[in-house]
């Protein structure tokens, strides 16, 4: 499946293949496009290849013995596959890793400053104040060791640290993981504000399909290293297959039990 490229697409991933340890093929000809200034959702179950896709874009595959063996990643008209991560960050791409990867033994403010290591020091104060505007809890705890914060606060810190880099494209990997529904709603609302106020393009990887599609303009669904469905977010939310297998709803609008949903691999109509 080939992604449709328009003049507004700032990121194009075309026919991408990724192999780990020279033997394990994880991405199998994946293609997608991200429109500038929008939030795009990338959905799928565990093991579908979502995180690998983000790492292929951000250049972090090499640290895990991964390699792009075919296809291309083009950002703002320039190929970036094969470029080292620091150069990719300098081009305006920043990834927030799954699992709240923060420095637990230093303070909140010191964590934030680490996010701005590619920026001029003259920007630090202004950038930190901007982060505190979006995340007031971080301002309240700026002198606290990050390891003593709650899971939701640590996720806010991870996103805030990314904002310190002044990204043009923000890659978010499972920001809702392990968080209570109210915190998920709060964090997604803040991400939406950052997108609108700062003009930051967002590629959002999630298993929480409803939350992700509710803030996105477009979405892609992955299975087994391939894109199996794509479209505008609203059309995906209204799609019976997506409702049944990713939102837990039956065709009559009834909640599906896990026992029903777990059979979806044998029944996915979009794979034929």
Regions found by a protein language model. Name each.
Residues 58:
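Helix-to-loop junction immediately C-terminal to a conserved catalytic motif
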Residues 162-163:
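ABC ATPase C-loop
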């Amino acid at each position: 499946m080939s992604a449709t490229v328009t003049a507004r697409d700032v990121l194009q991933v075309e026919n991408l293949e990724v192999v780990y340890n020279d033997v394990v093929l994880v991405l199998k000809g994946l293609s997608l496009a991200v429109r500038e200034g929008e939030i795009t959702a990338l959905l799928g179950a565990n093991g579908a290849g979502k995180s690998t896709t983000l790492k292929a874009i951000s250049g972090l595959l090499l640290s895990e013995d991964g390699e792009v063996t075919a296809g291309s990643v083009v950002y703002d008209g320039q190929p970036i596959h094969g470029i080292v991560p620091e150069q990719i960050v300098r081009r305006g791409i920043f990834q927030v890793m799954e699992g709240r990867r923060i420095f637990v033994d230093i303070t909140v403010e010191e964590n934030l400053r680490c996010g701005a290591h590619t920026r001029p020091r003259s920007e630090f104060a202004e950038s930190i104040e901007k982060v505190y505007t979006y995340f007031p809890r971080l301002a309240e705890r700026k002198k606290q060791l990050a390891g003593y914060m709650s899971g939701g606060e640590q996720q806010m810190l991870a996103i805030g640290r990314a904002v310190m880099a002044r990204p043009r494209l923000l890659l978010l990997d499972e920001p809702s993981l392990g968080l209570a529904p109210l915190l998920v709603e709060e964090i997604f609302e803040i991400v939406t504000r950052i997108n609108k106020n700062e003009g930051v393009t967002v590629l959002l990887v999630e298993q929480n399909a409803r939350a992700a599609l509710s803030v996105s303009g477009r979405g892609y669904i992955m299975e087994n290293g391939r894109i199996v469905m794509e479209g505008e977010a609203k059309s995906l939310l209204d799609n019976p297959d997506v409702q049944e297998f990713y939102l837990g709803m039956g065709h009559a609008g009834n909640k599906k039990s896990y026992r029903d949903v777990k059979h979806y691999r044998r029944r996915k109509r979009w794979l034929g």
